[in-house]
Amino acid sequence: MSDKILFRSGEATVFAKPGQFTDAMPEILIGDVSGPVGQAFANMMGQTAGHTRMFAIRACNQMVKPATMMVPKVTIKNSKMIELFGGVVQAGTADAIVDCLIENILPRDQANNLCIISLVWIDPQTLTDPNLDLKDMYRTNYEATKLAVTRAMRNEPSVEELIAKRHTMKHEMYDPAA
């Protein structure tokens, strides 16, 4: 059996194709069910108005392993957002987790002892976009989830990388030097 994984974190952003609001920005925690991530996972089983949590499932009766709890970063206000969260976003998230097992990014021998918390973003503009591309929304959530899990399991970025890029990389939404 591989070493026990106590606490890993990762994030990724995958941008939508032009003209879409389907950017995906999951933030991931991975850890053993007996540790702090497991405790947080158990505490999230209760529901909060507007922030419904869901297990990542591939299809009915096919919950992924490690057990993965999806939590929206935005308030779920209507049935369309529920459909996106529990449909295309859930499918992309679930498929990414299973593919991480297939590709040995997540250790198969710990699949029943790990849990994952995935904070997911759904841009409210998707609700009124008449040209919403669900395939692009699936793609961005799949790719971003897989990348976030990979980064978590590889402890990326390293401290050295963060220090080296401190003054060369800028936040996409705010540049204090501008």
Report the location of each language-model feature:
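Accessory interaction regions appended to the cores of large information-processing enzymes
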Residues: 1-178
